[in-house]
Amino acid sequence: MYGFINKILGVVLCFIMVVLMLANVMVSDQLQARRSIVAEVTNFVDEVTDTAVLDEKHVADLYLACSAYGPLVDVQILRYAKVVNPDPKSPGDTYMTYVGSDDIYHWNQGDLLKVKITEVGPTGLASFLYSVFGLNMAPVDFTLAGRIRS
């Protein structure tokens, strides 16, 4: 009788150890992928804000870099053009507003660059652990912005 109970306990403990190892690997990989994606987007924003140059090659490189780390992410690059308007309340004064623009390849000084990253779907290991044990991490969802300097 004791041998049977010990075998059951041994199988349960082995199963728990394997699951904990998979959970640890998933969390470690996810966190490393998130840090790498944030670093890529930060480098992209810094480069564009410093040089005010963006072409299709830069955009393709950003898409490829963000997709290379594991999580399937959607990258949106938004441009807000700086507009100086006369102030109707005080003649002679002006105020600034920002208007969304579809043209992301031509930049002026003072324009805002906004890069939004959202996760489209989980990785295979993450979906397995969620379906079996309910372990889940918050999806990748962040936005970085910068103002064009030159």
Model regions and ranges:
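Alpha-helical assembly-interface signal, strongest on the long, hydrophobic N-terminal helix that forms
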Residues: 2-63
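Short, conserved structural patches
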Residues: 53-150
